[in-house]
Structure formats: C-alpha cells, structure tokens
Design a protein with these regions (language model features):
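Active-site catalytic motif of lipid deacylating hydrolases and related acyltransferases
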Residues: 1-44, 79-80
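Short alpha-helix in the alpha/beta-hydrolase fold that links the catalytic acid
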Residues: 16, 154, 165-178
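Gly/Ala-rich beta-loop-alpha elbow adjacent to hydrolase catalytic centers
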Residues: 49-58
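Flexible "cap/lid" loop of the alpha/beta hydrolase fold
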Residues: 63-99, 127, 136-139, 194-198
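Conserved alpha/beta-hydrolase catalytic His-Asp/Glu region
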Residues: 102-142
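Short beta-strand/loop motif that positions the catalytic acidic residue
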Residues: 158-160, 164
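Catalytic active-site module of serine/aspartate enzymes centered on a nucleophile-bearing elbow/loop
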Residues: 178-208
Length: 208
C-alpha cells in the first residue's frame, strides 16, 4: 500500500492498519519531490492511493515509470491542483499562501474537516509540523505546479467527496472526465474513509 497524503500531512495522521499481507509506505512533506524508487521494486502488486495535493505529486513522480499497479485511486484531489475549473481556484490558493499564518492554518483545517467533531478528531492525532514548515511546503508545491503543470499519468478511479470544501466537487468532476468516478458523502478529510481505504476494505478497491 503506497499512500501519497496531502499537503501538511505527517505520520501521526494516518496510523491506520492496512490489509494483512501488505506493507505500507506513507509519503508526505513535498518540499522536495525526490522519491527512492528502489523502495517499491520487487513487489508483485502495489496499491496506489493519493489524496488532495498528493494526487498531483504521485502523478508527477510516476509519469514514465512502470510498476505492477493493482489499482490507482485518487481521493479528493486532481492532476490540476491550482485551476479555476479543475482544482482549487487560483485566487484562493494564492491568498492562502500569501497570508499564511497559524490562524490561516486553523481555518483551513476546519474547512478541510467540515465539522467541529471531525476537526477535534483530526487534532487528537497530534499534528506536530510547524506552520513555517507547512508554508514552505505549500510554496514548494506552488512552484512545482507552475513549472511542471499536469502529467500524463493515468488513474484507475477518482473518489469525490460531495462535501469537499477544498477541492470543489464540481471542479473534481470536470478534472476527471474520462476516468471512472465514485462519489461519497465525505468532507475533504474524513477519518472513516481513510480507515476503510488503508485497510483495503470496500468497493473502492474492486475493479468493476
């Protein structure tokens, strides 16, 4: 199970059990996009899961590389992360970066989680990275997205949370034309959804 988490992620947020027989590699902190491909060589089957900004990062990392993908799932993100029609509207992204602060981060997390209960659950996982680290990561992503744009990497399925307040669902639908879409009643970050996906349960991992 190879999981590219979203911007601002860290290990504490995704300490979930995975399906028996699978190893678990979590990728986060995109201040650099360096990836050691030898870590996943030798596997006969790899499940790729990417969330939010991790969708663009994974697309960038694996374009031109072939691995034995069992399934490639994108969750609440698109290959066009800064885009008025297919991602986060450009002015919103730029405003977040230009005015980034502890207060900005707190507001973002509330919007990402969608409810006070979900926000409390998120914070109970004790995120430890500093606001300055997260600002640096967001700035690095902005530079990379501007420099490289989208890639030709093909995803098998896109999962769209109908209550997502970060990547508007309408924009996600626009971005994923030609890709199989599954809709779910979820916020941008939904603990139960990630628990299910990382455990390998549910129809999301089933080929139709």
């Amino acid at each position: 199970m190879l999981f590219f988490a979203g911007w601002g992620s860290e290990e504490n947020l995704f300490r979930h059990p995975v399906e028996e027989g699978y190893d678990y590699l979590l990728c986060f902190d995109y201040r650099t996009l360096d990836f050691d491909y030898t870590q996943i060589e030798g596997y006969t089957e790899i499940r790729l899961l990417a969330w939010s900004m991790g969708v663009w990062v994974a697309s960038r990392v694996f374009t031109g590389h072939s691995f034995p993908w069992q399934m490639k799932l994108a969750v609440n993100g698109t290959p066009f992360p800064i885009d008025d029609r297919r991602g986060i509207p450009e002015m919103i992204f730029k405003g977040t970066l230009e005015h980034f602060s502890e207060d900005t981060l707190a507001r973002f997390r509330r919007r990402m989680c969608g409810s006070s209960g979900q926000t409390e659950e998120f914070l109970s996982r004790t995120p430890t990275r500093t606001a300055e680290e997260l600002r640096e990561e967001l700035a690095a992503l902005a530079l990379g997205i501007t420099a490289y744009g989208s890639s030709s990497f093909i995803w098998d399925r896109a999962i769209i949370g109908n209550r997502d307040k970060i990547f508007p669902p309408r924009n996600q639908h626009e971005a994923w034309q030609g890709t199989e879409i599954m809709e779910t009643e979820a916020e941008h970050y939904e603990t139960s959804l990630f628990s299910r996906l990382l455990e390998g349960k549910g129809e999301e991992w089933t080929r139709h």
